[in-house]
Regions:
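Extracellular glycan-recognition regions
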Residues: 1-169
């Protein structure tokens, strides 16, 4: 895949319907998306099951959230890999296969309202996550081999202006 998702310049709203919406509120404010999830984990996703090896890049600005980030190989709300920052100053590479497990974790200092330029790549069984241009985590897992991309939020809200998906070389 090679695609960029940005808020269109026109005032139409149909473009939002191309996203699978599984959050309490999905608002187009000054940013393309403002995701609000009052309790638990929520996600919006876009793409196809045929997407295999790619990198997703997005700006993520968490506000009063327990976790926020981006997801790859999304096959539903309980089947995905995600790169997320947590309220307790960590970054996690998470696998959700009907139950969540942390594949890799590290300390990562950030503040609410910071815009984090996140990317998560998958190629075969390799996963790697970057924040602000620095590789922060990597892991290997072959449980999910394809799927869409997503924006993830837990117990709070986050904002995103642009999402880009490119095929790995």
């Amino acid at each position: 895949p090679k695609v960029v998702f940005e808020r269109p310049k026109h005032r139409g709203r149909m473009w939002k319907r191309a996203w699978v919406d599984a959050v309490d509120q999905l608002i187009s404010w000054t940013e393309m998306f403002r995701l609000v999830q009052n309790e638990g984990l929520g996600m919006i996703s876009q793409g196809t099951r045929e997407w295999t090896n790619y990198i997703v890049r997005a700006d993520v600005t968490p506000h009063l959230a327990t976790r926020a980030g981006i997801a790859v190989r999304v096959q539903g709300l309980t089947r995905f890999y995600a790169l997320m920052v947590t309220r307790d100053q960590k970054v996690q590479l998470v696998k959700s296969l009907h139950q969540e497990s942390v594949l890799a974790e590290s300390e990562f200092g950030w503040s609410f309202g910071d815009t984090l330029h996140m990317s998560l790549g998958v190629d075969g069984d390799e996963l790697w996550g970057e924040i602000n241009g620095q590789v922060v985590l990597s892991a290997r897992d072959s449980s999910l081999d394809s799927g869409a991309i997503g924006l993830v939020i837990a117990d709070g809200r986050s904002a995103t202006h642009k999402v880009e998906v490119t095929k790995t070389d």
